[in-house]
A protein has these predicted regions:
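Active-site-adjacent pocket-lining segments in enzyme domains
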Residues: 1-109
Length: 109
């Protein structure tokens, strides 16, 4: 799986085609993509959010919606292979979902 950190790192990561290609590969192969806080902007730049439901820090809500995502103000949620968390204080809700998806993927391989 792939976990993308929050903070300012995603704004830097989204500038690299190799990062976006890897995110698209992980999504195409239905592998776990975990995002929290500002990390959703990487998925937005990778153009994989149309029709997906996720959460993030409210500061990028409109960016994600303009990329086609359904944004929900909740601590954490799963949409297929994408696990999203709102902010670092929501890690207690986010991490069990990440582990749930990893277990599901491990048992199906």
């Amino acid at each position: 799986g792939l976990l993308i950190p929050g903070g300012w790192a995603p704004d830097y990561l989204r500038r690299f085609d190799s990062v976006l290609t890897f995110v698209q590969y992980m999504n195409d192969h239905k592998k776990l993509i975990g995002i929290i806080c500002h990390a959703g902007c990487v998925l937005s730049s990778a153009n994989i959010l149309k029709g997906r439901t996720l959460t993030s820090t409210p500061g990028i809500k409109h960016d994600l919606m303009h990329a086609g995502a359904n944004w929900v103000n909740t601590a954490a949620l799963i949409d297929g292979n994408i696990v999203s968390g709102r902010r670092p204080p929501d890690l207690p809700a986010y991490m069990p979902l990440v582990l749930e998806v990893l277990k599901t993927q491990e048992s199906s391989e």
